[in-house]
From Swiss-Prot:
This is Probable glucokinase 2. GO terms for biological process: glycolytic process. One of its GO terms (molecular function) is ATP binding. Its EC number is 2.7.1.2.
Length: 377
């Protein structure tokens, strides 16, 4: 549960003439729990981040938010939430989502807007966002605040000219976490504000290289290993099957077995530990994390070219944690990204990697909460 001492900070904010305290709520739901930002409706620069609370099913999430609602009432019973947004993993249909980064039967991870406490998630003033949709709105918010560029480094500058992270036309925003997310940001003179299009393109099936490619044999064996685990060896895996927190342990299992003959139980392999071992130079882990990123760049290439993007943004916390490794293998990533059947399509396509921590999902949910709050009745 969240600390009431943090919630008390909202009493420092401006109230309305009738004494009401107008606020906005941004919430980001991850695989292990949720983060919440409460901000002043009158000034979005005045906010309190409540940190992390554990939740791995619908009941736990609703209990945490109901407890938060009671704590806000206890601190100031005249508060009114004018806009709320909550970021979730999984397709959203008719105000309902089955969260894909939680374990268990669909019934225990199905969430509707009606399930949420209505005082902090009011009807008609609350919205679900796909997690990468929220991240993309966070990129827009960071650009508006002039804090976007400082958190990214442009890769492959010998292949593309310098330019803004958020392109003037189309930008693909990608992130590897418990899954692989992708969203499109479109800026056009036809619209006053940038448009975000959430996608499920992390679930596109992998495009394998052919027989004459130098990496064909090893790549084919790795893809088959992943297919054996998920699809009885019959179907081509999706990019998320390797470019995710569940995919990295499978890659490590493959390379460790190839080197030692030992088949480690995949449930005993922790993705974070594999990444740390790779940073320390352990060969099996280096091979696994490198493959993890090679396929990530292949997914980025497919997404950015298919959507005619000028910029491709690799974002969120894992990208920051693995930044030294990314920079170390940059030449191999560059070769992968620009190796394409239509090389002229790659001209000028910029790639950015996040290098410092900034919670784009919280920024994005807060951005949308204020957009809802300021929307005319």
């Amino acid at each position: 549960m969240f600390d009431i001492e943090l919630v008390k900070k909202i009493n420092d904010w401006k109230v309305s003439e009738d004494g009401a305290l107008p606020i906005c709520i941004g919430c980001d739901v991850g695989g292990s729990g949720l983060r919440v930002r409460i901000s002043s409706f009158n000034d979005s620069e005045k906010y309190v981040d409540l940190g992390h609370a554990k939740a791995k099913c619908t009941k736990q999430l609703v209990d945490v938010l109901a407890d938060l609602e009671q704590k806000i009432k206890q601190v100031n019973d005249k508060f009114v939430c004018l806009g709320a947004a909550i970021a979730v993993a999984g397709p959203i249909k008719a105000g309902t989502v089955i969260l894909t980064n939680w374990q268990g039967e669909p019934a225990v991870r199905t969430l509707t807007l009606k399930d949420l406490p209505q005082k902090i998630f009011p009807k008609d003033r609350s919205v679900f966002l796909n997690d990468l949709e929220a991240g993309a709105y966070g990129v827009i918010a960071a650009a508006d605040k002039d804090i976007l560029e400082q958190n990214f480094v442009q890769l492959f500058q010998d292949k593309a000219p310098k330019g803004p992270v958020l392109a003037n036309g189309r930008t693909a925003v990608l992130a590897m976490g418990s899954g692989l997310g992708a969203a499109l940001v479109v800026r056009t003179p036809l619209l006053k504000n940038p448009l975000v299009l959430p996608t499920e393109l992390g679930h596109v099936q992998i495009a394998p290289n052919m027989k004459e490619h130098k990496n064909f044999k090893q790549e084919r064996e790795l893809i088959q290993h992943i297919s054996n685990h998920y699809y009885k060896g019959e179907l081509d895996p999706e990019y998320e099957d390797i470019c995710s927190g569940r995919g990295l342990p499978l890659a490590y299992q493959f390379y460790h077995q190839k080197k030692t003959g030992e088949l480690l139980p995949v449930e005993q392999i922790d993705a974070g530990e594999v990444a740390k071992k790779a940073m320390d130079g352990e060969e099996d882990a280096v091979d696994a994390l490198k493959a993890h990123y090679i396929f990530y760049l292949r997914a980025a290439k497919a997404i950015a070219t298919s959507l005619s993007c000028e910029s491709c943004v690799l974002s969120l916390d894992n990208q920051v944690k693995n930044h030294p490794f990314v920079m170390k293998i940059m030449k191999e990533l560059e070769d992968e990204f620009y190796e394409f059947i239509r090389p002229d399509w790659m001209n000028g396509l910029r790639v950015y990697s996040q290098k410092s921590i900034l919670n784009f999902n919280i920024l994005g949910t807060d951005y949308m909460a204020h957009a809802i709050a300021n929307k005319p009745e």
